[in-house]
Amino acid sequence: MNQELIINNKHYKKADKLESLNMFKGQLYETIVTTQSNEHVKNAAPIGVICKDSNHIVIHLDNCVHTHLNIMENGELIVNITKDPLIFTYSTLGELDEEYFGQFNGFPMINDSLGFFKAHVVKTIEKKRENDYNDGIGNVVTCEVEDIYISDNNEIVPLNRAMNAVIESLVYYCRFDHKYKDIQKEIWTHMKELNRVCQKVGNESEKESMKLILDKLKKNHAYLE
């Protein structure tokens, strides 16, 4: 329990339960999951993580994402807790730049995470999810937690309203041409309202994130205003 870890001059202390990260049974948390292929090509993606108990999580994966392929290939992942909206945004809109990555025992993680844990797959169930990617075929994956570390200098706190607006907009972005293909105009109107809220109460990173999301959608859909 007293084991300490230093990554890029940031101090972490070891913990033994997910509750140490303020993650509790039955709750879903927005995280950044880092993985790597067997060829050591790293990837980061926003993934909702459900806390099953003190040492197990459940995640839903779709076949179209690198994260899914990597996890199914080698069964390893790190779940990173961060409040940085740009990390969520960049890892959704494209590939995360190298500067955002650190390493834990040779495995990619996110620099400056508030906390993180390594996990490995113990159970996989194929499941059809209506209106999702790849004709709805994906996997529900249960993972056992191996190592939990918490930053010494940061308290893990709930996300604010502007950050929640960024997360919600990223969900809409990912599903815009699939689940929401028949109601895109309505979703776009709602996203513009989320942007209004973010511009009013958000910090500069949150505001920039919203601009990136909306600009990318407008680039891909010329009819949006």
Enumerate the predicted regions with their spans.
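Basic, polyanion-binding surface patches
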Residues: 2-116, 122-225
